[in-house]
Amino acid sequence: MRLDALEAMRLTRSNKQDKRFPNEEDVRYQDGLLFPSIRPRFTLQAPAKVFTIGSCFARNIELTLQDYDIELPTMGFSVPETEWDFRPNGLLNEYNPGTTSQRVLSALGAREETNETLFETGEGFLDLLLPGGYPVTRERAEERRREIDAVYGELASSDLVIITLGLVEAWYDEQDGTYLNRMPKPPAFRKDPDRYSFRRLDVADALPMLDRAMEALIEAGVEHVLLTVSPVPLGTTFTGGDVIVANSYSKSVLRVCAQTLAEKHPQVDYFPSFEIVGSGGTEAFNEDNIHVRHKIVERVTGHMLKAYFPDIRPKTEGEFRTVQDDVGAEESAARA
């Protein structure tokens, strides 16, 4: 952004409430959290179809949205515990900009998915495009991919697509030119040491991939995209530094990407879930300091709904359902 001096002064004068950081007397401070003012680029009415893409925080948002008159295609996918121990649709998690973009482009027919990312072990096949899970037969791995494709068949017809950006540390298949959602098993490195590489993405890497995904969504007819940055931290870093610092870098890159995309595309807006949760410090997280407390998720999602679905009401009054966290969360993208 670049403004001439008079325009900058005009904007500052008109931004009376929000231009200064809030103290505890400010209406944006509520019970230990800071809730930025939202000026939504668009609003929607229920019933609506909302498609959620991204890290485990996207799954948390889904569980809160279930209590409203909102259709959630991703909640229709599940796998048995023999394939995945945690949330039934947790295998839909996408962590890095590469896999997120690949998934969107594949769903919209702009990219072909390769079966070479099914890695054979002594116990079966692992799908490196998924964030985890146990080995299955090749037939089941291919069947599961078709099931996921069917879910993503609802993408273009959704009223709102919410994309939660997770991290920028990624594994890459040099042979296929494909970003992976999990680290290949060490035997794969020994078998073909030049095939896989670790990449820490910067803005120059991540932004073009995400921009292609935004353009594909818009071209397919999606009118509303809401970008967020997951407040769930990176669990493990492969950069050789402290994960606390690596996480800050990761979120900073994604935050810049989200802002840039929202400023470029009229159909895209940014929602500050990352800023809200971060304002609460470690008190906003469970004891692992990774997963966000569900009551905090409810408050964040409520703030989002108030802005983008101003007339929406819960289906029934009462307590929200209990959440089962995806153990490992952002970490699962980095380790086997």
Segments and roles (model prediction):
Residues 1-336:
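Extracellular glycan-modifying ectodomains
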